[in-house]
Amino acid sequence: MSFPTVFIDGDQGTTGLQIHARLRDRTDVRLLTLPAAERKEAARRADALNACDIAILCLPDAAAREAVGFIRNPAVRVIDASSAHRTQPDWVYGFPEMADGHAHEIAHAKRVTNPGCYPTGAIGLLRPLLQAGLLPRDYPVSIHAVSGYSGGGRAAVDAFESGDAAARALPLQVYGLALAHKHVPEIRQHAGLAHRPFFVPAYGAYRQGIVLTIPIELRLLPAGVTGERLHACLAHHYADARHVDVMPLADARAATHLDPQALNGTNDLRLGVFVNANGGQVLLSAVFDNLGKGASGAAVQNLDLMLGARHAA
């Protein structure tokens, strides 16, 4: 019996290493790997890209575009973990739970672009509410998120874990101060927003895990929309989702904090709705592993869908 062959182009980066770890002991796929001395040789990479059934690209954006250009075999399918193709119309966006039937679309796609880590939480919260008409498309969305330092890639991990004093000097590092983070167009397009969201990301002095929050003013929503209706919409949308759950309102009322590391090592996404009815305010939240549902876990979930595993979504 032959098994599908998977080639991870860029398997020594943060995401590539995680995907390799998730696949190496599986018996239903065969990993195609290159010797260390050949990993950066264009000709050898091109050979591997054309010899596999599914290529997973864990590369910087320019290198990912180059890798796609190397592929001449029309049978090769691609999952791109970079941000190079996330807003391209000829690529399927790899967030299975974001819409009815989307997992089926991924399962039959030739080209799948893995979502960014922050967009996973933002789109997961916003898209169902926008689709239901509970949140206007022109709502002035503000997104605040804190990720573990692994969100900065291999260089950030090496800096923090080597004891680099400068890297570890601040417990929290807010960045993207030009308000032009590369995830903004992705969030706007796939959430369905009419305008650019305001996005402020930060890195914390811990390895992995994200807490993302979006404040909502109920007075800016259509008449009759309450925090409870926002929660009910999300709960209904994700009722059958294997990897997304919505915190019950009672649990949200009892919560005193959100732990960004709570879902580390999983491919799960936990959404929350915190309501101050008297103040007319709601806080939407998403907690997940930036290396799990925000990267490698999502890639493997998409791979499983492309291989025909119905349980993956």
UniProtKB/Swiss-Prot annotation:
InterPro entries with a match to the protein in the record: AGPR_type-2, NAD(P)-bd_dom_sf, NAGSA_dehydrogenase, Semialdehyde_DH_NAD-bd
A GO cellular component entry from the record: cytoplasm
Biological processes annotated in GO: L-arginine biosynthetic process
Pathway participation: Amino-acid biosynthesis; L-arginine biosynthesis; N(2)-acetyl-L-ornithine from L-glutamate: step 3/4
Disulfide bonds: none
Pfam family, one: Semialdhyde_dh
Keyword tags: Amino-acid biosynthesis, Arginine biosynthesis, Cytoplasm, NADP, Oxidoreductase
Keyword NADP in annotation: yes
GO function terms (MF aspect): N-acetyl-gamma-glutamyl-phosphate reductase activity; NAD binding
Active site positions, chain numbering: 117
Gene3D superfamilies cross-referenced by the UniProt entry: Dihydrodipicolinate Reductase, domain 2, NAD(P)-binding Rossmann-like Domain
Localization per record: Cytoplasm
NCBIfam families: argC_other
Family the UniProt entry places it in: Belongs to the NAGSA dehydrogenase family. Type 2 subfamily.
Function: Catalyzes the NADPH-dependent reduction of N-acetyl-5-glutamyl phosphate to yield N-acetyl-L-glutamate 5-semialdehyde.
PANTHER family: N-ACETYL-GAMMA-GLUTAMYL-PHOSPHATE REDUCTASE, CHLOROPLASTIC-RELATED (PTHR32338:SF10), N-ACETYL-GAMMA-GLUTAMYL-PHOSPHATE REDUCTASE, CHLOROPLASTIC-RELATED-RELATED (PTHR32338)
Name of the protein: N-acetyl-gamma-glutamyl-phosphate reductase
Source organism of the structure: Burkholderia cenocepacia (strain HI2424)
Taxonomic lineage from the root: Bacteria, Pseudomonadati, Pseudomonadota, Betaproteobacteria, Burkholderiales
The encoding gene: argC
